[in-house]
Every structure is written in C-alpha cells, then in structure tokens.
Amino acid sequence: ADLAHRQQSVNRLLYKIYSPISSAYAELKQLSTDNXD
C-alpha cells in the first residue's frame, strides 16, 4: 500500500511539472501552424 501511495505522489508531481509544459508546447505548435499558413 505504501508503494502505491508513493507512486501516486510521484504521478501527481510529474503531472504538475508536465501539464504546463505540454500545454505550452501545444500553444507553440498551434502558433507555428498559424504562422505557416
């Protein structure tokens, strides 16, 4: 149970880190697509 709890904490931390990065990346991709048009 302790291992599962730790895994959950790690997942939450990774999500906190990667969520803004991936959304910013999506915005950049959208911008470059608009630019090429």
Curated annotation (Swiss-Prot):
GO biological process: oxygen transport
An annotated Gene Ontology molecular function: oxygen carrier activity
Cellular compartments annotated: Secreted, Extracellular space
Record-level GO cellular component terms: extracellular region
Keywords: Copper, Oxygen transport, Secreted, Transport
Principal localisation: secreted
Tissue-wise expression: Hemolymph.
The family this protein is said to belong to: Belongs to the tyrosinase family. Hemocyanin subfamily.
Main function: Hemocyanins are copper-containing oxygen carriers occurring freely dissolved in the hemolymph of many mollusks and arthropods.
Official protein name in the record: Hemocyanin subunit B
Source species of the chain: Cancer pagurus
Lineage of the organism: Eukaryota, Metazoa, Ecdysozoa, Arthropoda, Crustacea
